[in-house]
């Protein structure tokens, strides 16, 4: 497989722009005898036998892929973005570090929100590169970073950027991605984070680590064209600065923002009372009730 990693898997309808190297380890490369790989294989055998297969996505995100999956399962249902379905409920926003109040003082589309989820943290060298890129670019930022990782930041960074941005151990991600001041989401490209960014109409700078993250990042960059993968796959000061400039300032970034806004509108349409995801969700409930 090694010499074919750059090839696309166009034989799968809807994945014509995805490369072999974008797929998760254990699918077509890596340790195919691992527990994870064997689990994926067993899931692949079981899914066609399922009464229904439901996905946290929406039809218009990738219609060709949705049609392909629908042809392979007894009943295929897109029921997302689930974050938008749940947002219709009255919920108290948790913001213990005052991120949203800080955002109110920033201009529209100017802020970089940075978070890599709860599992992964970039290695020390990349954390330093992110900090250096932020400081040099002067881009306002909200950075969600575990407290134990603060020691990896350049000496004096927090003091020097006190007026430019905030570093917090936790941030209200959904609300930040909906805020008009947010201009870019720097992310690991976990699926929930990608959907939340799509739902907010926010372009992404992607730094995938494992699992489906590379595939998601590839889709963000070349399928939906709502962001870009970090240059050469890892953070460097200069590379990160160039990405921030491209997304927040250059014409390419304006196109990404426009595409992201269109997907946001389609996502909200999907979860409206007569939207496809809402109808599918009701269909899923009926299927579960009938089985019980």
Residue ranges of each PLM-predicted region?
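Short glycine/proline-centered loop/turn elements that form peptide/ligand docking sites
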Residues: 193, 204-206, 210-211
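Acidic donor-binding loop of glycosyltransferase active sites
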Residues: 166, 180-193, 202
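Nucleotide-sugar-dependent glycosyltransferase catalytic domains
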Residues: 1-175, 184, 198, 209, ...
């Amino acid at each position: 497989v090694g010499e074919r990693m750059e090839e696309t898997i166009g034989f799968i309808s809807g994945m014509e722009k995805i490369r072999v190297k974008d797929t998760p380890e254990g699918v077509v490369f890596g340790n195919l005898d691992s527990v994870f790989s064997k689990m994926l294989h067993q899931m692949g055998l079981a899914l066609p036998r399922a009464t229904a297969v439901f996905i946290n996505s929406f039809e218009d995100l990738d219609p060709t892929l949705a049609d392909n999956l629908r042809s392979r399962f007894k009943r295929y249902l897109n029921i997302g973005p689930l974050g938008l379905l749940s947002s219709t409920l009255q919920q108290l926003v948790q913001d213990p570090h005052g991120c949203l109040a800080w955002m109110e003082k920033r201009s529209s589309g100017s802020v970089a929100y940075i978070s890599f989820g709860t599992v992964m943290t970039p290695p020390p060298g990349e954390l330093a590169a992110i900090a250096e890129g932020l400081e040099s670019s002067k881009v306002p930022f909200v950075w969600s970073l575990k407290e134990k990782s603060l020691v990896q930041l350049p000496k004096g960074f927090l003091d020097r950027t006190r007026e430019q941005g905030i570093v917090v151990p936790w941030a209200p991600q959904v609300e930040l991605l909906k805020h008009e001041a947010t201009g870019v989401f720097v992310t690991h490209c976990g699926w929930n984070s990608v959907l939340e960014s799509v739902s907010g109409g926010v372009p992404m700078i992607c730094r995938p680590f494992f699992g489906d993250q590379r595939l998601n990042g590839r889709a963000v960059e070349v399928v939906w064209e709502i962001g870009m993968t970090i240059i050469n796959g890892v953070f460097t000061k200069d590379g990160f600065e160039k990405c921030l400039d491209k997304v927040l300032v250059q014409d390419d970034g304006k196109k990404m923002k426009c595409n992201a806004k269109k997907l946001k509108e389609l996502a909200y349409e999907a979860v409206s009372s007569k939207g496809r995801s809402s109808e599918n969700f009701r269909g899923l409930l009926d299927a579960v009730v009938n089985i019980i």
